[in-house]
Amino acid sequence: MKVILASKSPRRVEILEKIVKEFEVVQSNFDENTIDFKGDIEKYVKDLSRNKAIEVSKRLNEPSIVISADTVVFQDGKVLEKPKNEEDAFSMLSSLSGNTHKVYSGICLINTYDDTVVTDCDCTEVRFSELNPRQIRNYINSGEPMDKAGAYGIQGLGGAFVEGIKGCYYNVMGLPLNKLYKALENYDITIL
């Protein structure tokens, strides 16, 4: 059975390559703005990942396992997705500075052969160092934060701001590896 990653994220590709030998990437065209956050962060990221997987699965012509994910940073009851512009990134990084936040990733696996759908969610706590405005501006000028939830990438320059984490490192990158590995064990595909 084919494995399809419903994401254009190079970080998700890199993570999935750790456990799945062969897969294809098919970008989801689902409009994430059609789902509003209504207070339940786990439901929100699972709904987003499920809708991404459904959109891709409808375009496939052969039995496949479609994997999708959605990752957000959550702090003080607010969802921090990808920054809209540099000012938005500055605001996000300023609010994360010196504080602990949570990163939630929803994952979804759809078996297109029998239409089974599995969703799950992972949460990682991340503690940031105190950052001054110059550090934040320098980081924004690198361009790195502009395509990442919460305006930072733990696997890149943004990792310098992280004092510690509690939970899955790969979840912060965008794909909770252990949860995904456990979910994939139920399918007839080669993993590891």
Curated annotation (Swiss-Prot):
GO terms for cellular component: cytoplasm. Keywords: Cytoplasm, Hydrolase, Nucleotide metabolism. GO terms for biological process: nucleotide metabolic process. This is dTTP/UTP pyrophosphatase. The active site is at D70. Belongs to the Maf family. YhdE subfamily. The lineage of its organism: Bacteria, Bacillati, Bacillota, Clostridia, Eubacteriales. CDD domains: Maf. It comes from Clostridium perfringens (strain 13 / Type A). The keyword Cytoplasm applies.
